[in-house]
Amino acid sequence: MPKMKTHRGAAKRFKKTGTGKIVRHHAFTSHILEKKSPKRKRNLRKGTVMHKTDAKRIARLVAYL
């Protein structure tokens, strides 16, 4: 059986932690930032762990992360 191809778009958006969890960036950070508080914008800069069910789908797209 041939190797699976990595979904390049997904590979650029997600990272795997040392424990195997998948991390993603927050949305809502590109524009309309004036009304958002500094605390909210600061927290949006951090990554967040994906939900288990979503992570399973992403793991299929990027099997070799």
Curated annotation (Swiss-Prot):
SUPFAM superfamilies, per the entry = L35p-like
State the source organism's domain of life. Bacteria
The UniProt entry's sequence similarity note says: Belongs to the bacterial ribosomal protein bL35 family.
Q: Which InterPro entries match?
A: Ribosomal_bL35, Ribosomal_bL35-like, Ribosomal_bL35_CS, Ribosomal_bL35_sf
Q: Which organism is it from?
A: Desulfitobacterium hafniense (strain Y51)
Its protein name is Large ribosomal subunit protein bL35
Entry keywords, A to Z: Ribonucleoprotein, Ribosomal protein
- PROSITE patterns attached to this UniProt entry: RIBOSOMAL_L35
- Example of a GO cellular component annotation carried by this entry: cytosolic large ribosomal subunit
Q: Keyword Disulfide bond: yes or no?
A: no
Which GO BP terms apply?
Answer: translation
Q: Which GO terms describe its molecular function?
A: structural constituent of ribosome
